[in-house]
């Protein structure tokens, strides 16, 4: 079983890959595909934040960036 630090790091790596996909992919005519990818990204963020037990930091960050 992975240690908690490695477990968290693996989530961060997956999240980074999703973010790179969202920023580099061409979603010109496919809003549904983009929304699905963005939804996956948010779900992974909430998994990380839930694991850490800290939703406030994530929500504050999303508000600063006008996502909420």
From Swiss-Prot:
A GO BP annotation: viral DNA genome packaging
Pfam families noted in UniProt: Phage_C
InterPro entries listed in its UniProt record: C-protein (IPR016407)
Biological function: C protein is one of the proteins involved in the production and packaging of viral single-stranded DNA.
Name of the protein in question: C protein
